[in-house]
A protein has these predicted regions:
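Short, membrane-interfacial amphipathic segments enriched in basic
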Residues: 1-11, 344-353
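Generic detector of leucine side chains in alpha-helical contexts
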Residues: 9, 24, 30-39, 59, ...
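Membrane-water interface of transmembrane alpha-helices
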Residues: 231-239
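Extracytoplasmic/periplasmic domains immediately adjacent to an N-terminal transmembrane anchor
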Residues: 2-211, 408-475
Length: 475
């Protein structure tokens, strides 16, 4: 009989192939499930969102009290449906002044508002009779800085549709009277007024027309998380190169890490606010808003640094990509669209820091409108304080694991003289541990890294990558 082929790593080649296929299959399945689950989650935020446009509330106040004001209601009855925002009529007694309507939209109670101007019908009648009256019958209010893409596609476009249908409703109600009384054939101005009877005035609380507006609540929310993860890998690699976890105690390491994280996120948030401002085009924002945006983003970035620090300390390396990707996806899913048009399940995202950051930024950019500070700041500071309370335990865990790695590496030294005389057998036994490891730069000279020390070192300093531009033998 033919002897079974032996693998250099020990065991038969058949057994090695079997284990390889099992390991590969597990990674294959787990990663497929990871991306399937995360992408299904974020796609779910947009599932049938247009069928929930009725969840957007728009205010209507009739200061006219005549045919023009009634034509707006007739138009809404034609448009009413799940795919159209709900038009909520309020009596003049609640909003006695048109400025009160704007204030209601600014406050965030409504996504938009339409009101019939005082005397709109009589002014239009004068325009039809003499050609000299005002045809500015309606005024509409909206906030272009509040989820700009949805404000443009769902609110602004719906208001434009309402105005167009209001014209048709006006013809239905009043065309016969106008044709009987107005001098349309003799007065071109009267004819023009009849052809375009309803005109509207726009009040956009904060015009946000720049192309980069689509990135504010999407890519810009996830990049800080990825940025902190990459810097954490660099910081861990530098800590490994300089043996910080064994040379300094947990308190000094924690203080050093806190100072470095504050400085890094301070500059990182400045850069993020900087590129938002650099590509603002004609967006009307000032230096005060820049500073407030910078400080808000700084808090958000530091929260994510602390979260990544905690995750990388306690989560096994093989599961860390699952945690980081999932954290990034659920955060961006909480800002990608308004909760009004997402399934109710997603409203748990109110508890996530990215959603609250975006609410703060909208208020800053809207000159104080859409005030959500009563909820946003407590949630963000709760995350920050909770992470500050947990991160010392993560630092202590890293230092203890690094010391254990050093002790494990010093164990086999006593057996060196005994094993040196065994020749080839020793070489074969050392083969599995002969691959390069950053442990060689962490443990003191004269100590040999072992499988256990390598494992512990990876737990203490992982994930990490070597310090760019610095040779390990120089440290």
């Amino acid at each position: 009989m033919t002897a079974a082929t032996t693998s250099p790593l020990g065991g038969s080649s058949k057994e090695v192939r079997k284990n390889f296929v099992i390991a590969l299959g597990m990674s294959f399945v787990l990663l497929q499930l990871l991306f399937l689950g995360n992408l299904s989650y974020i796609y779910g935020t947009q599932y049938k969102d247009s069928a929930r446009f009725h969840a957007f509330k728009m205010l209507y106040v009739d200061y006219d009290g005549d045919v023009v004001g009634q034509s707006v209601l007739d138009a809404y009855e034609i448009l009413r449906g799940n795919g159209y925002p709900s038009l909520i009529q309020s009596p003049v007694s609640v909003y006695p002044n048109p400025k009160d309507v704007k204030a209601a939209v600014c406050k965030g109670d409504y996504w938009g508002a339409v009101y019939a101007n005082p005397g709109a019908s009589s002014n239009l009648s004068a325009a039809l009779a003499t050609g000299s009256g005002s045809r500015k019958s309606l005024t509409y209010v909206w906030n272009g800085a509040r989820y700009p893409t949805f404000a443009q596609s769902a609110i602004y476009s719906s208001i434009m549709t309402l105005i167009q249908v209001t014209k048709s409703s006006y013809y239905t109600r009043n065309a016969s009277n106008v044709l009987a009384t107005a001098p349309l054939s003799k007065n071109p101005a009267s004819l023009q007024a009849f052809l375009d009877p309803i005109q509207a005035t726009e009040i956009n609380i904060k015009a946000t027309q720049q192309g980069t507006r689509v990135l504010y609540n999407t890519v810009s929310m996830v990049m800080p998380i990825i940025q902190q993860f990459f810097f954490m890998m660099a910081l861990n690699g530098i800590s490994a190169s300089f043996h910080l976890y064994t040379k300094l105690g947990p308190n000094k390491n924690g203080l050093l890490r806190l100072c470095v994280s504050l400085a890094y996120t301070f500059i990182g948030s400045l850069c993020m606010a900087g590129y938002i401002w650099a590509y603002r085009e004609s967006w009307d924002v000032n230096s005060n808003q820049f500073t407030l945006s910078w400080m808000s983003i700084w808090l958000y970035m530091h929260i994510n640094f602390l979260i990544v620090d905690i995750l990388t300390a306690f989560i096994p390396l093989q599961f860390l990509p699952f945690c980081i990707l999932t954290w990034a996806i659920i955060n961006v899913a909480s800002t990608i669209s308004p909760f009004e048009i997402s399934p109710g399940f997603y409203r748990w995202g109110y508890a996530l820091p990215s959603h609250e950051l975006y609410q703060v930024l909208v208020q800053i950019w809207s000159d104080g409108c859409e005030n959500q500070l009563h909820r946003a700041l407590p949630i963000m500071f709760s995350w920050w304080i909770a992470c500050l309370a947990i991160v010392p335990f993560a630092m202590r865990h890293r230092c203890q694991t690094a010391l254990a790695a050093e002790q494990a590496a010093s164990g086999p030294i006593a057996d060196d003289k005994t094993t040196a005389s065994q020749g080839g057998s020793t070489d074969r036994e050392a083969t599995p541990h002969s691959r390069a490891s950053s442990t060689r730069g962490i443990v003191p000279q004269g100590q040999r890294p072992t499988a256990e020390s390598i494992r512990l070192e990876n737990l203490a300093y992982g994930p990490s990558y070597p310090t760019p531009g610095v040779r390990q033998d120089e440290l």
